[in-house]
A protein has these predicted regions:
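Membrane-embedded alpha-helical bundles of multi-pass transporters/translocases
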Residues: 1-260
Length: 260
């Protein structure tokens, strides 16, 4: 993989900004906007329809399933990316596919099937979209973050890249948690706000433009210098074994209880 030039590092560090912003908005605001519970004022702007449009019990179960998938999907995603065979390498196609599907599911999440109260159909619809979103968000972001060690020339560049990324993370959270409530105060509905932010997903295209990989098609003359199968003597872990380890992890179970 071609290494980044020094001036390209801040651009590459910004690539994750949009998708991570959408992830914060859907998990913090849009999911809560499906029901009125917990909102003391401006309910008409904090929610989609100033009423509960999902069957709360059913949607809670489906939301917990999406949280479970959020943890489990990392193993098959890593396996998928590692074994991807395309003329454009592994990371760029994975980032593009993940971003496109993630963005479509995010936009669809802003359009309920109906505004009927306690709707079972809405519950299933939003539960499925949420699961699709977290799965393909993980695909895109893991593929992106997986390039950090490969695309930098040395430890100093890697530290610079991660530090700038952390700064953009702080900006992203500041906008999500401080600015969005201001928009709500101006009378803008959370669904509209969510749609306004959707184009930010395109920031990840910066990474797609900067990543330069060789073909991973069978028989390709060139091979990745970072191909771990050439330098790692450890036995590979199967996808099933990886899922089993994840399910048996106490840390993962605690995370699931908190976020589920």
């Amino acid at each position: 993989m071609r290494k980044l030039k020094r001036w390209q590092i801040p651009l590459f560090a910004f690539a994750h900004f949009g998708p991570c912003m959408l992830s914060t908005i859907i998990s913090v605001y849009l999911v809560d906007a499906l029901q009125v519970a917990g909102f003391g004022s401006d309910v008409e702007n904090w929610t989609f329809a100033a009423k509960t449009i999902v069957a709360v019990g059913l949607f809670s179960v489906l939301k917990a399933i999406s949280s479970l998938m959020d943890g489990l999907v990392e193993v098959p995603v890593a396996t998928f990316v590692q074994n991807l065979k395309t003329p454009w390498g592994r990371k760029r196609p994975a980032i593009l596919v993940g971003t496109i599907v993630m963005t479509l599911s995010y936009v669809l999440f802003c359009f309920p099937l109906s505004l009927e109260e306690n709707s079972v159909a809405n519950s299933i619809y939003f539960g499925v979209l949420l699961t699709i979103f977290v799965s393909f968000f993980t695909l895109a972001i893991n593929a992106l973050f997986g390039t950090y060690a490969e695309i930098t020339e040395n430890d100093n560049d890697r530290i610079l890249l991660t530090n700038i990324k952390a700064a953009f993370d702080t900006i992203q959270y500041s906008i999500a948690y401080a600015l969005i409530p201001v928009f709500i105060g101006f009378g803008i509905n959370i669904r509209e706000i969510g749609l306004y932010f959707a184009p930010l997903a395109a920031t990840i295209l910066i990474a797609v433009a900067l990543i330069k990989e060789d073909s991973t098609m069978p028989g390709a003359v060139k091979k990745y210098a970072d191909d771990t199968t050439n330098v790692d003597d450890d036995e590979p872990v199967s996808m099933l074994e990886g899922v089993k380890w994840t399910l048996n992890s106490k840390a993962f179970r605690a995370w699931l209880v908190i976020h589920g």
